[in-house]
Amino acid sequence: MTFEKVGVIGAGAWGTALAQVAARAGLAVTLQAREPEIVAAINDTHENAVFLPGIALEPGIKAVADLADLADCDLILAVAPAQHLRAALTAFAPHRKAGAPVVLCSKGVEQGSLKLMTDVAAEALPGAPIAVLSGPSFAGEVARNLPAAVTLACEDEALGRAIAEAIAIPTFRPYTANDLIGAEAGGAVKNVLAIACGIVEGKGLGRNAHATVITRGFAELTRLAVALGARPETVAGLCGLGDLVLTCSSPQSRNMSVGLALGQGLTLEQALAGKVSVAEGVASAPAVRALARKVGVEAPICEAVAAILAGEVAVDAAIAGLLSRPLKPEA
């Protein structure tokens, strides 16, 4: 199976960066944006000044506003924010070319339903071949052609290889897997943990505490993913541990920057003020907490972040609660 035309749903930073990758791979790229001004700017100036300012876009990228304009695309990258993915895919469903696979590139748990993105896609696009792309990949670096590697998970392994081969370039390496739940669970939970790491930084609690949050957070991530049906070796790869380390280690991370502001004493409203791109962890935190409770998984760091974001507990009290937990075996 080969692909020639790629449609990208969502022209935020990550969607635009993936459009860059696909264009560099020699594919014809149609990038859909809801905002008419972004469509016009990309087509006229070859720049997404709102989400990726200062980065020249590949000439092979064409921007559109109407999802119907993706009807001739034989591969779809769905990059709408997690809480808007269902609406985007439902609107796109009548226009999907028969047999066109849909690669889910959004990370999160849907509020209310507590569904992962593959479940959302299966309901919005019945019968569509689904894959998941996830891994340590800041959009700005990918768009500037700096090296990155990701997980491309698809139950149909031949299809997964075909998609990986279609979008791979020397600076963007997709490693294939067949564990969709593992690929997406890691990406959903790591955003919540990145907020926790940001809080640690904002409070000045030191590198020891930072490393502890990453490590114990990864234990929470793994427990939840396995309870949902993932294999532990999947979340130990790029889509889980790799993405967690990146997102928890740089203020470039939208989620970590929110936590940093909270740790410095700002309110959530102040922390989010002026942010153009979505910090998925803010929306996913209550859903991750509810999902962990539903499947009986202990996730104290995710619980604390969700409680802080909901205004149920102050930052200092949440930290004190974590530090006073009973001692237990590490495993």
Swiss-Prot record:
Gene that produces this protein: gpsA
Subcellular location: Cytoplasm
Role played: Catalyzes the reduction of the glycolytic intermediate dihydroxyacetone phosphate (DHAP) to sn-glycerol 3-phosphate (G3P), the key precursor for phospholipid synthesis.
GO molecular function: glycerol-3-phosphate dehydrogenase [NAD(P)+] activity; NAD binding
Entry keywords, A to Z: Cytoplasm, Lipid biosynthesis, Lipid metabolism, NAD, NADP, Nucleotide-binding, Oxidoreductase, Phospholipid biosynthesis, Phospholipid metabolism
EC number(s) given by UniProt: 1.1.1.94
Protein name: Glycerol-3-phosphate dehydrogenase [NAD(P)+]
Recorded metabolic or biological pathway in which this protein acts: Membrane lipid metabolism; glycerophospholipid metabolism
GO terms classed as biological process: carbohydrate metabolic process; glycerol-3-phosphate biosynthetic process; glycerol-3-phosphate catabolic process; glycerophospholipid metabolic process; phospholipid biosynthetic process
Keyword DNA repair part of the UniProt annotation: no
List of residues binding sn-glycerol 3-phosphate: 107, 135, 137, 190, 243, 253-255
